[in-house]
Each structure stands twice: as structure tokens, then as C-alpha cells.
Amino acid sequence: CMGGTQHTNGNNNTRAYCALQLALGNMGVAGGGANIFRGHDNVQGATDFCVLSHSLPGYYGLSAGAWKHWSRVWGEDYDWLKARFDSITGKDGKAKSLMNLKGIPVSRWIDGVLEDKDNMDQPDNVRGMVFWGHAPNSQTRLKEMKAAMEKLDIMVVIDPFPTVSAVLSDRTDGVYLLPASTQYETYGSVTASNRSLQWREKVIEPSFDSLPDHVIMHKFAKKFGFADRMFRNIKVNGDEPLIEDVTREFNKGMWT
């Protein structure tokens, strides 16, 4: 796991994990091996969904074929999706759709705000930022990050507790804190590094006004007017999408 490998004795830790599994007879058998859960809760699952800037879920990339594949899975019209993306003029003078271009990674979002837009491969600077389960003190360039936060039009922090994201800047407006539930206040699957799934049940109800991530996401989609498209294949009970249907949908698209 990330806690073991990033330790000062990471190599020795990893060798010890493997030696322990060998001693217990858990190597070379079904369900065996040192297939751990990466880092904090469900890092592998998030990676498989590719909530990053360079790929669609399942590591399909951003090609037209990848978009058409996921359009079929979602039951969405590919041309409608394509029309939602702006385009830029490349160095060769040809128009390029942002749909097929890599976005700004989380480590460089600061530049998306502060950089001269003439130097960027997108029509405008980043004007809004959502920190969802992410504290910026895990990155460098905090002085520039503070300046970027203060330049944003809007900043949203979604976490069980207020993080550095909520207090780093000196801005007094345009910051919204949304309390998210912890892993014990919801249910669903988490994925190990060998892609095996572990299903977890809810232990307690969400505390106070906090909500699970998938409920917050549905509320956003409904507010922005595309919930009917986003949850076309997913049953929604009130404001809570059915996790089992979410699981069926991503399994349908990620056979690899």
C-alpha cells in the first residue's frame, strides 16, 4: 500500500509483506497474493474510473473510438456529447476538439488559473475549482496556490472535515463547504490492486447534514439540468442513486 511503500523503509516493508504471504501459503492460489488496497480508501477504484485529466474510465484514453464506446455504455448520443466541447486552433492551424485533448492535471491546476491564457491549449483560464476529498498541502507551490485560490470565481470544498483547502486563502466569499459522509456512512465496492472487489455495507447513517459522494453528485447533476442523462441507466431513490446500478454500468464498460 502507499503507506508502506512511501515509508522510509519502503523496500523492506514490501519484501516483508511478500515474505509473510509466502509463509502463510497465500501465494499462487486463487484469492491469494499481496494484492493490497492502495493508500487510503479506494485509490485503485478512483484510478480505474480515471477521474484524472487524460483518460476515460477503464484506461480507454480520449480517442473518438473511446468516446463512442462509452457513449454506447451510457446510452448517450455521441454527437450530442461532442457538441458539448469547445475547440482550439492547433499549431498546424487546424481546429482540435478539447474532447480529445488531455486536460490540466491536479498538480498543475494552479497554472490553469494564473497562466496567460494565450499560453494554454484551452480557450479560457480555470475559474472554478472543486476540491473533492483532496487537501492541497499534499502538493508544492503553496504560495502560488494561495494566489490561485484567491483569483478563482468560485471554490467548493467537499470533505468530511474542513481541510487546508478551506482555510489556505484569505478570500471571504465564493467559498462553499459541503460536508461529505465517511466510508462508514455509505456502502459500495472498493477495489484492490489486482482489481478484485470488496463490497462494504453501511455501518451508521450519515452524521448531521453530511451526504455520501454519489448523493452530492446527483444533486449537482440535477441542479445543472442533466441528471436524467447522467443517471439514465441508474435507479435513483429520492436523491440517492442505487450503487448496485452504478456498479453494473461501469462493469458493462470496463471488461478489460
Task: Please provide the spans of the model-predicted regions.
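Non-catalytic alpha/beta scaffold blocks inside enzyme catalytic domains
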Residues: 1-16, 23-29, 36-255
